[in-house]
């Protein structure tokens, strides 16, 4: 039996995935979490084989939660299930310790296949995302996102900023000083040739890394 933890801040999304999996032989949803912090705690105290993880959630978010789970509970396999398919996110997520990467638009059977694949020790990346990643290696000048130059930590902080989180919130959630968070911010601004959080969010929207609704919280 493959024990699965569902992690998403939208209850409706979790309910939908649970319905998909509840009749699948050999797969059991053993728990749910609505934020990265709870997902990390769940994996440390319960028997979990595979985590279906959302990227953008309140708190530390899916990227940092993936890193923490991969470090502390190496046997747990993580599949990032997200609307964000733009380079460089898939590669950064896999580097953080995920075993799989799927779009939330994936067919139910592909979700099942991904769970079984990562449980058996393989990696699973949706074919369209894998093609995009391969193309970026062949023709980087045509496919590379401006965000490809960001480090994993910079990318993580960028996603938190585009959700409207402030420096003090980010520093508390990531156990970094506000000064360190600001250093990452200004480094990002320099790399991306921008001058502030709103401009960062506009750029992220243009490249599919967040949606326009986030601007209302800026």
Curated annotation (Swiss-Prot):
<dbReference type="GO" id="GO:0000160">
    <property type="term" value="P:phosphorelay signal transduction system"/>
</dbReference>
<protein>
    <recommendedName>
        <fullName>Response regulator UvrY</fullName>
    </recommendedName>
</protein>
<keyword id="KW-0804">Transcription</keyword>
<feature type="domain" description="HTH luxR-type">
    <location>
        <begin position="143"/>
        <end position="208"/>
    </location>
</feature>
<dbReference type="InterPro" id="IPR011006">
    <property type="entry name" value="CheY-like_superfamily"/>
</dbReference>
<keyword id="KW-0902">Two-component regulatory system</keyword>
<feature type="DNA-binding region" description="H-T-H motif">
    <location>
        <begin position="167"/>
        <end position="186"/>
    </location>
</feature>
<comment type="function">
    <text>Member of the two-component regulatory system UvrY/BarA involved in the regulation of carbon metabolism via the CsrA/CsrB regulatory system. UvrY activates the transcription of the untranslated csrB RNA and of barA, in an autoregulatory loop. Mediates the effects of CsrA on csrB RNA by BarA-dependent and BarA-independent mechanisms.</text>
</comment>
<dbReference type="InterPro" id="IPR000792">
    <property type="entry name" value="Tscrpt_reg_LuxR_C"/>
</dbReference>
<keyword id="KW-0963">Cytoplasm</keyword>
<dbReference type="Pfam" id="PF00072">
    <property type="entry name" value="Response_reg"/>
</dbReference>
<keyword id="KW-0238">DNA-binding</keyword>
<feature type="modified residue" description="4-aspartylphosphate">
    <location>
        <position position="54"/>
    </location>
</feature>
<dbReference type="GO" id="GO:0000156">
    <property type="term" value="F:phosphorelay response regulator activity"/>
</dbReference>
<dbReference type="Pfam" id="PF00196">
    <property type="entry name" value="GerE"/>
</dbReference>
<feature type="domain" description="Response regulatory">
    <location>
        <begin position="3"/>
        <end position="119"/>
    </location>
</feature>
<keyword id="KW-0805">Transcription regulation</keyword>
<keyword id="KW-0597">Phosphoprotein</keyword>
<dbReference type="InterPro" id="IPR016032">
    <property type="entry name" value="Sig_transdc_resp-reg_C-effctor"/>
</dbReference>
<dbReference type="GO" id="GO:0006355">
    <property type="term" value="P:regulation of DNA-templated transcription"/>
</dbReference>
<dbReference type="GO" id="GO:0005737">
    <property type="term" value="C:cytoplasm"/>
</dbReference>
<dbReference type="InterPro" id="IPR001789">
    <property type="entry name" value="Sig_transdc_resp-reg_receiver"/>
</dbReference>
<dbReference type="GO" id="GO:0003677">
    <property type="term" value="F:DNA binding"/>
</dbReference>
<dbReference type="InterPro" id="IPR039420">
    <property type="entry name" value="WalR-like"/>
</dbReference>
């Amino acid at each position: 039996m493959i024990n699965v933890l569902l992690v998403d801040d939208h209850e409706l999304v979790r309910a939908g995935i649970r319905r998909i999996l509840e009749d699948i032989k050999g797969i059991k949803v053993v728990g749910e979490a609505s934020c990265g912090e709870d997902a990390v705690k769940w994996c440390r105290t319960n028997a979990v084989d595979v985590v279906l993880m959302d990227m953008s959630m309140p708190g530390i978010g899916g990227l940092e939660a993936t890193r923490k789970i991969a470090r502390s509970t190496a046997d747990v396999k993580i599949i990032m299930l997200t609307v964000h398919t733009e380079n460089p996110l898939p590669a950064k997520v896999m580097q953080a310790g995920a075993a799989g990467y799927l779009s939330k638009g994936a067919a139910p059977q592909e979700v099942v296949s991904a769970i079984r694949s990562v449980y058996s020790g393989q990696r699973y990346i949706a074919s369209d995302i894998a093609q995009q990643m391969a193309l970026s290696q062949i023709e980087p000048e045509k496919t590379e996102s401006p965000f490809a130059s960001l480090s994993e930590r910079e990318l993580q902080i960028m996603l938190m900023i585009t959700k409207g989180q402030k420096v003090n919130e980010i520093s508390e959630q990531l156990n970094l000083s506000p000064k360190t968070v600001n250093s990452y911010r200004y480094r990002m601004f320099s790399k991306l040739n921008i001058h502030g959080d709103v401009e960062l969010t506009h750029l992220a929207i243009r490249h599919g890394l967040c949606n326009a609704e986030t601007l209302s919280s800026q």
